[in-house]
Design a protein with these regions (language model features):
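Short, charged/polar N-terminal "headpieces" of proteins
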Residues: 1-51, 112
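Short, surface-exposed, charged amphipathic helix/loop patches that serve as local interaction elements
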Residues: 35-112
Length: 112
């Protein structure tokens, strides 16, 4: 287990730069979510969800928002700290960031 420059223990699942580069080749957009918990830093790597995954998560959200979050998390998670999925506080913190990453992007419409 490594420590970062702030002295926090880093839990990243042993993900390497080579893993990240491979994922970028497979998924185009890959992002890292860091969740600090006391003297620990939990790191997770995610990709953008497919339209099918977003539809599945939206369908589940009508009856159970937490289950919807689990669907999205599990479908986008590439690697990193398994504690992010198992610890409810870490999970909810990661989900906040994941929702930001997959949320609406800036767009515009122009009349021609």
């Amino acid at each position: 287990m490594d420590k970062n420059k702030e002295g926090k223990k880093v839990f990243d699942g042993g993900v390497t730069e080579a893993d990240v580069e491979k994922w970028k080749g497979q998924h185009r957009k890959v992002f890292r979510i860091d969740v600090a918990d006391g003297d620990e830093l939990h790191v997770g790597y995610f990709h953008r969800p497919s339209l099918q995954l977003m539809a599945a998560a939206a369908k589940v959200a009508k009856s159970d928002e937490v289950k919807s979050g689990e669907t999205l998390f599990d479908g986008c998670f590439l690697g990193g700290s398994e504690e992010m999925r198992q610890d409810s506080v870490l999970f909810l913190s990661a989900m906040q960031e994941l929702n930001k990453a997959v949320g609406a992007k800036a767009s515009s419409l122009k009349n021609l």
